Amino acid sequence: MLSKNQRKQILLLKQKKYRIQKQLFVAEGEKVVQEFIDAGHEMHQLYATFSFQHPLCESISGEEMQQLTHFKTASPLLAVFSIPEETALAPSDLMIALDGINDPGNLGTFIRLCDWYGIQQLVCSPTTVDCYNPKTVQAAMGSLARVQCHYLDLAPWLQQSELPSYGAQLEGQNLYTSALRPKGVFVFGSESHGLSDAVRSEIDHFITIPRFNKVSGAESLNVAIAGAIVISELFRSSFPTQK
């Protein structure tokens, strides 16, 4: 049976300050939990409402799981993992950076995108949502087990970087006529505020996804969708054209 203290400690991990203090985070759902297990992340607790073969697994009822979940509907599997020790940002020809992305779902989607395209690091401003927020962990669908998020002040980092930097915004060079390659730092800002002034001042080039419906009332694309389009275009252009 689940103790009151166990329940309290897990629910506290919904808050960033407790995740930092305890250096722990919660993962929910069979796929997400299994991805972290397979990646070798240190696990402290594991709860299941079904028979799950693992030495740490504790069987609990569906009602107890509903008391633990950070979501409206509980998944049948929940685990508590250690937050991995942060390693230094490794040199890479292609970097994705996020400036003030505060929606957990958008960050989770960027993490999935990086994983899909083999980008193992994601650079985030301090104003970007915590990657171990339960909603981000869920949205990343296990990709967080393979992609490391680095939180740092973007402006001085961009200033020191030897890579060319590209900022995504409404006014910029047409993405489809830019002949870009997967080399450089590509920076995405929040939908509501765009790139911060400090970051914008360090950007070398600005790119935009042209709007084809000129009479549309749509003001912008969702930032994660924009990120998917840009990253896909970078890799598409790296393939040789078939004759």
Where are these regions (language model features)?
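Boundary-proximal intrinsically disordered activation/regulatory segments immediately upstream
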Residues: 1-49, 128-129
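Short, hydrophobic beta-strand segments that form beta-sheet elements in well-ordered domains
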Residues: 25-27, 42-49, 59, 80-81, ...
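Amphipathic alpha-helical repeat scaffolds
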Residues: 29, 102-110, 219-226
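RNA substrate-binding interface of SAM-dependent RNA methyltransferases
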Residues: 38, 88-172
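Active-site regions of enzymes building and remodeling cell-envelope glycoconjugates
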Residues: 53-66, 93, 163-165, 179-185, ...
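Glycine/small-residue-rich loop that forms an oxyanion/phosphate-binding "nest" at active or ligand-binding sites
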Residues: 57-82
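Structured adenosyl-cofactor binding patch, chiefly the S-adenosyl-L-methionine
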Residues: 116-117, 131-145, 200-243
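Active-site/ligand-binding-proximal alpha/beta "capping" segment
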Residues: 167-217
